[in-house]
Amino acid sequence: IAGMDRLVRLNVIAKSGRAVEAAGDVHVLLLDKTGTITFGNRRCTAIHPAPGVSAKELGEGALLASLADDTAEGKSIVEYLRELHPMVEPNVATLTPVAFSAETRLSGVDYQGRIYRKGAVDSLLAFIDVKRTDLMPALVREVEKIAKTGGTPLLVCVDGKLLGVIHLKDVVKP
């Protein structure tokens, strides 16, 4: 049990004490992350507002930035936020979608003259012309905590104002 507890602290999952004992004899480990032990797609599990931003403001901004996002991650953000922060949603036809691309690593919408975006930390910071060293310490800590636990942090902004962080993670199957 003590060995399993130490592994959990390092984000390693062991299903039995025998597995922990056998791991002592392992010299090479090859992992196949295709959904064997997880559902295989990252899901939104939390949002963390920036200092001075309410959870409602972040939730609405992240929801709008995700409404036109057809990816599994985008759909999970919408699903999560519809429960957490219900709001009157605009008709998707009134949104101008900005699709995710590997080059920009951003997505979002333009709606009623406002620019809603979410994306990878470095990409979103470049989009709003903010250096990583100028990022609020509270957001830096949250981004690092999410990444350290194996999650994916996404920053959210509206009209260049950082609203906070979305926590995406691959959920382990029961």
Predicted regions located by residue number:
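N-terminal sensory regulatory modules of PAS/LOV and PAS-like folds
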Residues: 42-43, 77, 121
